[in-house]
Amino acid sequence: MAAKIRKGDKVIVLNGRDKGRTGEVFEVRPTENKALVRGVNLVKRHQKQTQAQEGGIISKEAAIHLSNIAIVGKDGKPTRVGFKIQADGKKVRIAKRSGAEIDG
């Protein structure tokens, strides 16, 4: 099955602690059905000191389940994703809310 959410997409969080926040997907984990979104779902991690970096408590993004995020449409609202096959046989993603192509 083709991926409905891909790296580089602007998404909004639908459920959870960060509900309503938006960010850009920078990693998708299809086997886990999860994604990492920049600046969303931050958790504190204890990092051991190494020669390269300093130790301490750092904030980093935790994975969010794909069912809890949705792509932001051109109108700024969350939209579902569908697929459409163009005349030349290319499969493209479309926004169900507006019918506009997400990627061309």
Swiss-Prot record:
The terms describing its cellular component in GO are: ribonucleoprotein complex; ribosome
Record carries keyword RNA-binding: yes
Q: Which GO terms describe its molecular function?
A: rRNA binding; structural constituent of ribosome
Q: Which PROSITE patterns match?
A: RIBOSOMAL_L24
Signal peptide feature range: none
For this UniProt record, give its keywords in alphabetical order, as a comma-separated list: Ribonucleoprotein, Ribosomal protein, RNA-binding, rRNA-binding
Entry-linked Pfam families: KOW (PF00467), ribosomal_L24 (PF17136)
* Keyword presence, Chaperone: no
Q: Report the record's Gene Ontology biological process terms.
A: translation
Tell me the function of this protein. Answer: One of two assembly initiator proteins, it binds directly to the 5'-end of the 23S rRNA, where it nucleates assembly of the 50S subunit. One of the proteins that surrounds the polypeptide exit tunnel on the outside of the subunit.
Q: How does it assemble?
A: Part of the 50S ribosomal subunit.
Question: What family does the entry list?
Answer: Belongs to the universal ribosomal protein uL24 family.
Q: What is this protein called?
A: Large ribosomal subunit protein uL24
What phylogenetic lineage does the species belong to?
A: Bacteria, Pseudomonadati, Pseudomonadota, Alphaproteobacteria, Hyphomicrobiales
